[in-house]
Amino acid sequence: MKSLHANLLRFGVLVSCLALPALKASAQTDADALMIPKNMFCAAAVYDHSSWNDYWEGTFKRNNLNIGTLSANSYMFMGNYGITNKLDFLFTVPYITTNASAGTLHGQRGFQDLTLTLKWLPFQTEIGKGVFTAHAILSGSLPLSNYDPSFLPVSIGLGSTTISLRGLLNYQVGRFFVAGAAQYIERQNIDINQNAYFTTHEIYSNNVFMPNMNNVLVSAGYRSLKLNVEAIVQQTTTLGGFDITKNNMPFPSNTMNSTTAGGLIKYSFGAVSGLELTAGGNYVLRGRNVGQTTDFFGGVLYVFDFSKNHR
């Protein structure tokens, strides 16, 4: 069983450095059970394209000829550093562009939100033929630019500073694993560029109350030293908010619920140590006040070894 522990640590180098933004159904490092070893750093550049034609106005699914197809392109730089074998530090910096294919809405572009994460492995034990681990993940995010969060659906973000805590359980037997996680996200209020707005009633202020959120996910897949294949289903729920009113635009404090299914595949090159490629996609199965989004992503990752014993 000691060899299994060693292999899991090696898998951490190869797999755990991919970190897409929160709420993506992908092999995010804040949502998987892999740790990068001490003094190793994984750098990643990832491109993501998402689009939708239909969206839910409350629970009513519809399209909007004044929007057409809403698309977004995300260019992300991410890093993951092993402080110890049981504590990782991660960051994500995304640059986002949006576009509506119809109507008069002008697409937006700019840096979105910086996300910083600490990922801790406090518990690990052998159960049967596998290894069971428990993780605690603390994350925070804040806007990197002065974008307009109220210009939905083409805004590049919601403009809220957040802090979140995720608990994750994972069980791996050989090269196969299953995992589950739950996350609570606290969001600060935001200011918008107008002095009054309507939710369920008229509010004379530029300050918007942002309801908190939670997220639960289950994942399963296959991991080896060269190949990683993973499937993920997750549910995101807003703890409050209100529905988009008929024929109106979305608002930052809307209830935004979604059930998403996704998957990824990642390959590590034996000929070039540390070089990896990844690709995957996600689809919103059902939602409330969100678009029925399809997205695809691809990226390049490279692992640097800064350990003193590296030769």
Roles of regions detected by a PLM:
Residues A31-N39, K86, Q124-T133, R175, ...:
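Short loop/turn motifs that connect adjacent beta-strands in outer-membrane beta-barrel proteins
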Residues W56-G58, N63-L65, E202-R311:
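Outer membrane beta-barrel transmembrane domains
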Residues N39, S71-Y75, R109-L114, F132, ...:
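Residues that define the transmembrane beta-barrel architecture of outer-membrane proteins
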Residues Y47-N53, V93-N99, P122, G140-N146, ...:
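Transmembrane beta-strands of outer-membrane beta-barrel pores
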Residues T104-V208, S253:
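Outer-membrane pore/translocation modules
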Residues C42-V46, D88-L90, T117, T133-I137, ...:
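Residue-level detector of the transmembrane beta-barrel scaffold of outer-membrane proteins
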Residues A45-Y47, F77-Y81, F91, L116-W120, ...:
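Residues on the lipid-exposed face of transmembrane beta-strands in outer-membrane beta-barrel proteins
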Residues H49-S74, P153-S155:
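Surface-exposed strand-loop-strand hairpins of Gram-negative outer-membrane beta-barrel proteins
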